[in-house]
Amino acid sequence: MNKNNSLLIILGFLYCFTGFAQIDASHKSTYEKVDNLLYLIDKMYVDNVDKSKLECDLVLGMSNQLTPYSAYQQSEKIAHLSIKEQVAYESIGISFKFKGDTVLVENVIPNSGAQKSGIVAGDKIIKIGDNDISDMYYYSDVVEHLIGKKNTIINIELIRDADTIISSVIRKNIPHYNLVVLANPKLKQSINDYENAIKYFDAIYPDSVENSLITEHGIRYMLEQLDPHSTYISLEDIHDMTAPLKGSFTGVGVRFQIVKDTIIVVQAIPGGPSEKVGIMAGDKIVIIDKENVGGIGIKNSDVRDKLLGEKGSKVIVNIKRTSIKELLEFTIERDKIPIYSVDVSYMVAPEIGYIKLNNFSANSVDEIKKAVYKLKSEGMKNLILDLQNNGGGYLMTAVDLSDEFLSGAKQVVSTKGRTFPEKAYETKFKGLLENGNIVILVNESSASASEIVSGAIQDWDRGLIVGRRTFGKGLVQKPINLPDGTQVRITTSKYYTPSGRCIQKPYEGGSIAYRKEKYDRYISGESFHADSIKFNLDETFETKLKNRIVYGGGGIMPDYFVPLDTTGTSKYYNSLIRKGIMNQFALVWVNKNRKKLESKYSSFNKFKSNFNTDKVIKELISYAEKEGLEYNEESYKKAEKTINIRLKANIAQDLYDYSRFYEIINELNSTLQKSIELIQDGEAFKKLAKI
């Protein structure tokens, strides 16, 4: 019996269903989109692919849009039960994905308990019952807590904009067939054909099915099964995904924050349209193009949509400024706004410069050069480049940045794929940083382009890598625009460091295990002890000049290990940060005291040397209590130093500019502090670098 026939028998048994509708012409574009994508994967993907499995994965992903009981959200709580027994269990009726330490609600099923309790798409769940989302690492962990006996109630704590809400949600009204059909492994294996699945969903699902939407979910799931980095980008997400790497976007040029449903300008970007017309930090935006934007429910995305637009177009904003009764009206002409990848650059010690790079964009090397010229004019002879939490970006930017450090013609990286020949990238020009000691700071979130630069510096014995083992992303994606304007990024090759290492960590366990691997390092002790790292002895290599032993197959191992420091944190501190209370308070407090602060601390250096948070802390604690965070003396004392420094950094950011935050907070950056010590202790540096 073939799979299509078995599908018909199962459907007929469960639903007395006797046939599929004819293919509607409206489905044609989605069919073509899927066909094009399957063809591209077959021709370009880094490894051989099973086309039939691809299409099966596509269908499984489509089913997730219609129900929370998808292939990768299947609950072990009910998997062993018979179909009849499974019917007694229901969920609250949402589909979701992880977003940081929260669960982002993507869709709410009509008439479900979630909908009736007021949960909406975009809500961020932080707690289910007594269980924090931050303690969950698998989709199945979340599902285990969402699923329960029919008509039972669960408390859901969530964040909507800046507000924390607790909803009592009943497990009820998830349609019977969602659980039976999509939790049935036999049936899931039977629906393995895209065209068949579209007909199937049209035929049995009681609500109208938007095929383009469920197809997008299917494509995402299918690509996720290939590897963790092949991905699909919708029209809505393309701008947010590409703007940081392009290095600019078109808008009015303000950083803002929403506090108590009020849009407050944190900074008018220097040289941008808003600064030119006179908008200032602390201004409150109340009207945009004659529409009142103050009030309950305003979101960051709503504000961005109103302020972004075509270059040369105009937007009228009305501002409430402290000490001025009347609203101020400004007409702003939208223009290109730079997105900087250098967060900060300054001298951290005599002769030692520091640059923090947040990604590898089209403009990153120019930004680095500008910073280097400035630092050299201030006496820099050695550089610390901070790539901690830098997730990467353009490969060629990584190559060009490495060229600034390496002399002569040296290979930086090579790439090789199944259908793409090996290609080597070498240094070509005389760089600004070919002399002096170099330290690269890395951690478990330094990935991709960050690892290319770190690998090249390490393999050519040019400097020291300090911190913790990097993420381990050695796959290269090619962005491909689809006819409908959406985009896919398909892994086409792997990259290799100059010594021949591929530092890609294993991903055969699936995307969830892949993402969780960073947490596994924490649990195993690797984040705290270098000797807890398990090297793959089959992936042993030597550096090019000093013949030091280095390893492949799982990130770049630093030359000097700095453990993760958790001694200065506590539950109270984490709540101040996670709930946004610290940021909100600092902005409100600075706005209230701005004139006095600007008069007393006319320069940042005065502020850094003389400002004390002792009196402000009491106001922060009071503000936090009003926001629902109960004060805990023991928890506060445990993180007292961290809380004070973080508050001072937030105030500096709001009073001066974004970069000043790092000049304060870096006092807590143990990896940076150790790197300064290594450079200043010349013998220790030479011993590690084998100079």
Residue ranges, per PLM feature:
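Flexible, acidic/glycine-enriched loop-and-adjacent beta/alpha segments
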Residues: 464-496, 510-523, 528, 532-535, ...
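Conserved functional hotspot residues or short segments at active or partner-binding sites
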Residues: 502-503, 507-691
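Bacterial Sec-dependent N-terminal signal peptides
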Residues: 1-27, 37
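Metal-dependent DNA phosphodiester-chemistry modules and their immediately adjacent helices/loops
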Residues: 448, 496-502
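Amphipathic alpha-helical segments that form the core helices of the histone-fold
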Residues: 56-67, 217-227, 606-624, 646
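Generic structural signal for buried aliphatic residues
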Residues: 125, 154, 285-286, 315, ...
